């Protein structure tokens, strides 16, 4: 019944309009008795292979002139099928066999530059006219090639810090409206701005708090710590957080030395294994002797670089405090050989045993020294305590980074601490705490 109604309707329409063309593939064979075509009729969806084939056949029949009649030949109802503009764009930008989609040649670039100069009208070249002079190229291709590559006003140098700050602030206010953002960045194209945001700035910005650039105003100078961390991809989130903590600490008066508690006073702890494993006894011993385990890190007195020194010293304070809080003393100092992991056994195997001669157990500055890199400006005074029934074959290593007043990394301080017993303790059978300088 449906098939007969569709046939009668098509016959009546052909009688009224003799010039109309019956839609191709509108009626399937009688054995199936249904309208063929894709199941999805939304004009917002992608083109199907069947629609492309029908459009190609109809364009050849009408020689690409009457696009309204060409659109009527596509399958679907009047509300769901493609309109004339969609058909024209699909043919000219995708299906036209004479369309060139490859890379631009040098001759094409030179010709396009000359045509733009000839057809320039109020800084808006007529791209439809220019495309007719370039076989195989459409107006959109010519416009994008000129604005993104050939325009002499384009800035192709690396992005500066000021440009990136403007981009961050503009994106917060305008979103992904690259045309509006391009007005604030002369010489940067919309495509360049979009690519730089998605590939570089956005990824780096995700590592920082959301309110980091909320107070940035065009032309203002940002804070040096966050500025350096943002523009240096090698820095980590921990470094940026430490820098922010140092800046907050700089607002309040601080002492010129560092109070550092490195661990436990093992002399006051029972020698039994249970006392080492008990968390309550360990914490109580720490509270009772923490006042005697302080080391001082003096700040160098230099009036010229006072601000830089304060920043560097306070940053080192934070790092040393973090190391003290996470210092796992029982895993390093132990009276009995506990079952160690493979990594610990490997390190114990290749660690050089400490010499047992009299000279090696002298607590002099030559034997107990902290080495620093040549670029560091400060020396550290550090002390630790230990106890045990035999010489300890362990080494403590700490690395600290230094920055200059411009926020650049200018050195690394390395602490390598070797814990040795004193000569007098070996004779008496006791290992007493000593100061490590």
Swiss-Prot record:
This is Transcription factor MYB3R-2. Pfam families: Myb_DNA-bind_6, Myb_DNA-binding. Residues 1-46, 352-374 are annotated as: Disordered. Keywords: DNA-binding, Nucleus, Repeat, Transcription, Transcription regulation. GO terms for molecular function: DNA-binding transcription factor activity; sequence-specific DNA binding. One of its GO terms (biological process) is regulation of circadian rhythm. The keyword DNA-binding applies. Residues 67-95, 127-150, 178-201 bind DNA. InterPro entries: Homeodomain-like_sf, Myb_dom, MYB_TF, SANT/Myb. Disruption phenotype: Aberrant circadian rhythms.
């Amino acid at each position: 019944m449906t098939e007969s109604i569709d046939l009668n309707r098509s016959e009546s329409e052909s009688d009224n309009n003799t010039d109309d063309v019956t839609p191709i593939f509108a009626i399937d064979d009688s054995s199936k008795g249904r309208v063929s075509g894709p199941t999805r009729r939304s004009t917002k969806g992608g083109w199907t292979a069947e629609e492309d084939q029908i459009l190609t056949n109809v364009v050849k029949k009408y020689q690409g002139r009457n696009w309204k009649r060409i659109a009527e030949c596509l399958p679907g109802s009047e509300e769901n099928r493609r309109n004339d503009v969609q058909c024209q764009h699909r043919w000219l930008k995708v299906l036209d066999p004479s369309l060139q989609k490859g890379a631009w040649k040098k001759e094409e670039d030179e010709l396009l530059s000359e045509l733009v100069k000839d057809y320039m009208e109020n800084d808006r070249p007529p791209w439809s006219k220019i495309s007719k002079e370039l076989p195989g190229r459409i107006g959109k291709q010519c416009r994008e090639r000129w604005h993104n590559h050939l325009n002499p006003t384009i800035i192709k140098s690396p992005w500066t810090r000021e440009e990136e700050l403007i981009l961050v602030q503009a994106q917060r206010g305008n979103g992904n409206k690259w045309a509006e953002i391009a007005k604030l960045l002369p010489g940067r194209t919309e495509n360049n701005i979009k690519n730089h945001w998605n590939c570089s700035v956005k990824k780096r910005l995700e590592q920082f708090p959301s309110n980091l650039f909320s107070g940035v105003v065009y032309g203002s100078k940002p804070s040096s710590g966050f500025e350096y961390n943002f523009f240096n991809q090698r820095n980590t989130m921990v470094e940026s957080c430490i820098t922010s903590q140092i800046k907050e600490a700089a607002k309040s008066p601080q002492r010129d030395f560092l109070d550092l508690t490195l661990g436990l006073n093992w002399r006051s702890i029972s020698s039994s294994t249970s006392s080492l494993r008990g968390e309550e006894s360990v914490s109580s011993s720490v509270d009772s002797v923490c006042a005697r385990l302080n080391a001082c890190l003096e700040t160098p007195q230099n009036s010229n670089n006072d601000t830089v020194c304060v920043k560097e010293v306070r940053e080192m304070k934070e790092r040393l405090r973090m190391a003290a809080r996470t210092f796992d003393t029982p895993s390093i100092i132990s009276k009995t050989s506990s079952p160690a992991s493979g990594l610990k056994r490997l390190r114990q195997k290749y660690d050089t045993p400490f010499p047992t001669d009299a000279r090696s157990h002298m607590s002099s500055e030559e034997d107990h020294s902290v080495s620093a890199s040549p670029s560091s400006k400060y020396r550290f005074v550090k002390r630790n305590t230990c106890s045990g029934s035999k010489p300890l074959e362990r080494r403590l290593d700490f690395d600290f980074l230094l920055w200059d007043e411009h926020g650049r990394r200018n050195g690394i301080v390395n602490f390598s601490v070797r814990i040795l017993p004193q000569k007098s303790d070996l004779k008496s059978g006791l290992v007493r705490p000593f100061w490590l300088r």
